[in-house]
């Protein structure tokens, strides 16, 4: 989770608390993961309270890894400000340090939500918490709009 500080100053951020819990187990044929996050905001007029749950899996397939992820975010401060995210990605190793990857991801927003996809090769729901400058900074025009992303790339680790 992150706060896009370029969208404006974070007010009262020092009083926010987060509870994070995650569990994963490698079954050999697949590796499921579950994550839960809860945000407690001391000043709901400035910061939203929410909880988020994510379920995903990573499965060896055709010499690479196929990853699938689904998450739900429940905004506990605003009505109709929840979101779903679904994504999948396949990564194929060309060498020990170089991978090709491709995937697709989508965020489905409620009518009062404007959550966006963070640029990059992953399949997780990321949040833009500033209700006045949603998705691309154009204000509330993007409330209730869904966001999709198709990505391909190459990753080399040095």
Where are these regions (language model features)?
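Outer-membrane beta-barrel and related beta-rich outer-membrane complex signature
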Residues: 46, 112-136
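Intrinsically disordered, low-complexity segments enriched in small/polar residues
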Residues: 6, 26, 61-62, 85, ...
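Detector for outer-membrane/organellar transmembrane beta-barrel domains
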Residues: 1-93, 103-106
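A contiguous, mid-protein "functional segment" used to position or interact
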Residues: 86-123
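Outer-membrane beta-barrel "beta-signal"
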Residues: 141-158
């Amino acid at each position: 989770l992150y706060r896009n500080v370029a969208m404006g100053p974070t007010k009262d951020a020092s009083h926010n608390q987060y509870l994070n819990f995650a569990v994963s187990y490698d079954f050999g044929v697949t590796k499921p993961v579950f994550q839960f996050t809860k945000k407690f905001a001391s000043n709901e007029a400035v910061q939203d309270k929410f909880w988020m749950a994510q379920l995903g899996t990573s499965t060896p397939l055709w010499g690479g890894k196929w990853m699938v992820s689904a998450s739900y975010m429940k905004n506990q401060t605003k009505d109709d400000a929840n979101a779903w995210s679904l994504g999948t990605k396949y990564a194929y190793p060309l060498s020990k340090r170089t991978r090709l990857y491709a995937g697709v991801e989508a965020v489905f927003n409620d009518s009062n939500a404007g959550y966006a996809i963070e640029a990059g090769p992953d399949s997780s729901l990321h949040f833009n918490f500033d209700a006045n400058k949603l998705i691309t900074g154009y204000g509330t025009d993007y409330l209730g709009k869904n966001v999709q992303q198709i990505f391909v790339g190459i990753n080399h680790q040095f």
